[in-house]
Regions:
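Extracytoplasmic/periplasmic solute-binding protein
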Residues: 197-222, 245-297
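A structural signal for multi-pass alpha-helical bundles of membrane permease subunits
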Residues: 582-943
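Glycine-centered hinge/linker elements that transmit conformational signals in sensory
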Residues: 247-252, 290-333
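C-terminal capping/gating helix-and-loop segments adjacent to ligand/active sites or protein-protein/ligand interfaces
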Residues: 449-527
């Protein structure tokens, strides 16, 4: 009867599960066509739309432009498409083409820092019809097949450009070749310098146009706070300003005691955005294109680049002494989270910013001025030219939707739309900030006299001297590649390890650039010699074969470990389906869920490791090349080493302390509830708040909470804490040694030494100043033991402290909850054990070593496995929030994340993920073997 009921129940459960999947699935589409009773509605999905609820003038103008497009669309449709659609119903469908309207929808999706949102949408088949494109990611999007060419003659979008002539004056075509947009429209919208960015070879080797700018060109200028310049008696910058003038002004303004800094710079993987202006002004280039070979090459390793890096490093980290005798570093603020607020408060003297061609700026000209970027040492000015761009998604299936999407792109900056936006901005009080040429174009020439003096001229200089943001092969990675030498050079200067002479220092800078330029050419361009490629393939094949063999033995061992022993002297039982049928049936839903949502995706995704995987285009088989590249990739192995460091710190600081805390809370004679509440309180704070709070604690100036504390502790304090911990560890080691437990004794000695070195290292800046000979430092140690730290610590950017700084917030927030399970387990230890230990004369340490730890051994082991795996699993998110991988904290998981979702290298990222799994599987099997022998029993109830 039971079996019959079971046979009926299980199929019913699967049917309900299937129906639930059907009803909960909500397949989102991009654009589509709706047949209303008396009209046809074309729905268009756009990556973003202006918010109609935002009352600011600029947004109201943008909203008005969108509304005008929806109002005028029926006229455009009737003029350009209605008759064509009626004539070809097989291609365009049977719809009411006499009454058509359009509805726009803002694309939605998960927003993840560091990841292109539209990339996630494309991967999930939810891409908008109109994509946002910028210069640096344009090549990746073009070569990946994300963009639809806009100059197909049959479409009539841009028209036929095959015979077009493009020069410094713009584009020109013969009348017979026109079609689509006119030359006048194109020249009004597209700056001649932008044509190489949007018109180039695609994935099939054909030169086509892939995107169209909107909003006008963007030029980089130098903005400055007039109030700060006046406060420090500095003449305002001019068009003739040089690097020396910039440095002199930054030095005069910088006053960390008041929170004033000369120049705003930044950190993170794209810090080189700030440096690239100096690179171009010095005469250097990021990458160059050879039309004969149709190839790109990274070239930021020249002597000019070294000069730019040297100047930038001095701005960032040069050592100087303020009026109070305190050591300071650099003349810039690089705190990304606070820079915007500091600029608004008037605490930063200068910053680089973009100026829009149409709306020059909305800053207060009474407080903020702007000039072109300073001239370099050779008299060159290297501003940046950029532009926002729109492109059509290549997988728009319905040509009607694609035509409607193009009309949106075309109208966005059409003369009619720009005229309306200009009118609204003039009426809203922004007229004086509009480029005078548009004021004259639309009849507002009388407002031109109100425009801030020189702004239009400076914009023209920025465009004339500007170079397009890197747009070459895989240029989405360019900023990250150029940031590596910047970070290394800064750290060398912070550690006082750079030569004092200009020639020697430039040589060091040049060597850094050569090293990382070579890495950029390998990772971005793929420059690997045939001989090296052959070597990599051979090594990768050998390693993969070894892994397969190892996996075979590992899974065989797992099978043996978890096979139930036979009864008596019989053989081990295998599956025993008949005996355990009910148990197997109950496990089926859970097993199927794990199979469907874990193992099948893993197996399907694993094939990506052997391909140059493309989301839309056909992927190319590369064999073991991805594995060969990562085996010879220093950056990958550095990330693995960082992951090991992070895991060790997590185990040392978040696994063991809760055990110690639980013992103390158990033994404290009074106030147990109060202490437990105090230690548990941090757990009620959300993770994001914890991160933000600790990032404020880590502020690199003396105003940071942690620095304010550390600056008032003498060197002997750090050494004393380390020495105290060493003594405690040695006390434990001594008791273990007396009981002939030598392995444990050695472990405690090693832990004590590490704790001593770790805490004592905080005194290194006091005891061993940078640039001083070791002998001199040793002679001065007795006197320096009572000295204080000479300067604030840069906790999250200093490679020596960044990793542990990422772990400390976890310790603070996790110790309280982590000790609860041990407190519960300690309650299960019978009092008889402690009494027997007292009778035997056991000390407090003896009770911990020979009563507590043996009783908690199984629990500690289980938690250790979870803590170890969790340290690898959670490292990516924690590091991303705290440092973004800066300060030599990029762990393996974060490295894989950037490789896949920022650089679109899915094949190499998958190979890295598998390699990481291979490394961890041995540890996991070893722990499974131990856990298979653990016997669990309920704790005995105390009387």
């Amino acid at each position: 009867m039971k079996r019959k009921s079971l046979r009926r129940t299980i199929p019913l459960l699967f049917r309900l599960l299937f129906l639930a999947c059907l009803f909960t699935s909500d397949e989102a589409e991009a654009g589509w066509i709706e047949d209303a009773p008396d009209k046809t509605i074309i729905h268009l999905n756009v990556w973003t739309l202006p918010d109609p609820n935002n009352p600011d003038t600029f947004t109201r103008a943008e909203v008005a432009g969108v509304n005008l497009f929806k109002q005028r669309f029926p006229d455009f449709f009737a003029e350009r498409y209605s008759e064509k659609y009626k004539a070809l119903p097989g291609k365009y469908g049977q719809h009411n083409w006499d009454n058509v309207e359009i509805q726009l929808h803002k694309s939605t999706g998960i927003v993840v820092e560091g990841v292109e949102v539209d990339l996630l949408q494309i991967a999930g088949d939810l891409a908008p019809d109109i994509l946002y494109v910028n210069f640096r990611k344009s090549d990746n999007y073009i070569q990946a097949g994300f963009l639809y060419p806009l100059d197909k003659p049959e479409d009539g979008y841009l028209g036929d450009l095959r015979e077009a002539e493009i020069d410094g004056d713009g584009i020109s075509r013969s009348d017979s070749d026109l079609g689509g947009m006119t030359d006048e429209e194109l020249n009004c919208r597209i700056n001649p310098k932008i044509w190489p960015v949007i018109r180039r070879k695609g994935p099939h080797g054909k030169v086509q146009t892939w995107a169209v700018p909107y909003g006008g060109a963007l030029g980089k200028v130098l903005a400055y706070r007039k109030d700060l310049f006046d406060e420090y008696g500095i003449s305002h910058p001019t068009v003739d300003w040089t690097w020396d003038d910039l440095m002199a002004a930054a030095k005069k303004i910088t006053n960390p005691a008041k929170g004033h800094y000369g120049l705003q710079l930044g950190r993170g993987k794209h810090e080189s955005w700030y440096w690239i202006t100096f690179l171009w002004s010095a005469g250097g280039e990021v990458m160059v294109y050879d039309p004969e070979d149709d190839s790109w090459l990274c070239t930021f390793d020249t002597h000019e680049a070294a000069i730019a890096l040297d100047f930038y490093t001095h701005l960032s980290a040069e050592k100087w002494i303020d009026k109070q005798g305190k050591i300071r570093r650099g003349y810039s603020s690089k705190d990304a989270s606070e820079n915007s607020a500091k600029w608004e408060r008037g605490e930063i003297g200068m910053q680089f910013m973009y100026v829009d061609e149409k709306l020059l700026a909305t800053i207060n000209p009474e407080v903020v001025g702007m000039v072109p970027v300073p001239l370099g040492p050779t008299g060159k000015r290297g501003a940046e030219l950029n532009s926002r761009m729109m492109g059509l998604f290549s997988r728009i299936e319905d040509p009607v939707v694609r035509d409607a999407a193009w009309e949106y792109i075309r109208f966005y900056d059409a003369r009619e739309a720009v005229a309306l936006k200009t009118q609204i901005m003039v009426e809203g009080g922004l007229g004086r900030f509009i480029n005078p040429k548009y004021l004259r174009m639309f009849g507002y020439s009388e407002i031109e006299r109100l425009s801030p003096k020189g702004w239009a001229e400076y914009f023209d200089i920025a465009i004339a001297t500007g170079k397009p943001e890197p747009y070459g092969k895989n240029s989405n990675v360019a900023y990250a590649m150029m940031t590596f030498p910047i970070q290394e050079a800064e750290q060398l200067m912070l550690n006082d390890q750079l030569p004092q002479t200009d020639a020697a220092r430039l040589q060091v800078m040049h060597e850094l650039l050569i090293k990382h330029n070579h890495r950029a050419n390998v990772e971005m361009i793929g420059l690997v010699t045939p001989e090296e490629r052959s070597t990599r393939r051979t090594v990768a094949t050998i390693v993969l074969l070894a892994i397969v063999i190892a996996f075979t033995f590992v899974f065989r061992k797992i099978s043996r470990i978890f096979t139930a022993p036979g009864e008596g002297d019989g053989e081990q039982q295998t599956w025993a389906f008949r005996k355990y049928l009910p148990a197997y049936l109950m496990l089926i839903p859970a097993a199927l869920s794990i199979l469907v949502w874990s193992y099948i995706p893993v197996l399907r995704g694993s094939a990506m490791a052997f391909f140059d995987y493309q989301i839309l285009r056909e992927s190319t088989w590369v064999g073991v090349d991805n594995f060969g590249d990562l085996l010879f990739d220093d950056a990958w192995w550095l990330s693995v080493w960082n992951a090991l460091r992070y895991s060790f710190l997590v185990i040392a600081l978040t696994f063991m302390p809760p055990i110690v805390l639980a013992i103390f809370l158990q033994e404290v004679p009074r106030g147990k509830l109060v202490f437990r509440t105090i230690y548990y309180l941090p757990a009620v704070i959300t993770g994001l708040v914890t991160v933000l709070m600790w990032k404020q604690f880590y502020e690199p100036s003396e105003n940071g909470a942690l620095n304010a504390l550390m600056l008032h502790i003498p060197a002997i304090g750090f050494v004393g804490v380390g020495l105290a911990l060493l003594i405690v560890a040695l006390a434990f080691a001594r008791r273990l040694h007396l009981n002939e437990m030598y392995g444990g004794a050695i472990g405690f000695i090693g832990a004590g030494i590490l704790l001593f070195l770790g805490f004592s290292s905080l005194a290194n800046p006091i005891l061993f100043p940078g640039g001083e000979a070791m002998v001199d430092s040793l002679l001065h140690i007795p006197l320096r033991l009572f000295s204080f730290m000479p300067e604030p610590n840069k906790w999250l950017t200093n490679p020596e402290t960044a990793m542990i700084s990422c772990v400390i917030p976890m310790v603070w927030a996790g110790m309280g909850p982590g000790c609860l399970i041990y407190l519960a387990a300690l309650k299960g230890i019978p009092d008889d054990y402690y009494e027997a230990a007292d009778i035997d004369g056991a000390s407090f340490i003896d009770k911990i070593l020979f009563v507590v730890f043996p009783m908690l051994k199984a629990l500690i082991l289980i938690n250790f496995v979870g803590a170890f795996i969790g340290s690898w699993y959670a490292a990516t998110g924690n590091i991303l929030l705290m440092t973004g991988g800066g300060g030599n904290t990029e762990v393996a998981g974060l490295h894989i994340w950037y490789k896949a979702f920022t650089y679109l290298k899915f094949g190499p990222a998958t190979a890295m993920a598998w390699m990481l799994g291979f490394m961890l599987i041995g540890f996991t099997v070893h722990q499974l073997q131990i856990l298979s022998r653990v016997e669990f029993r309920a704790a005995t109830k105390k009387d």
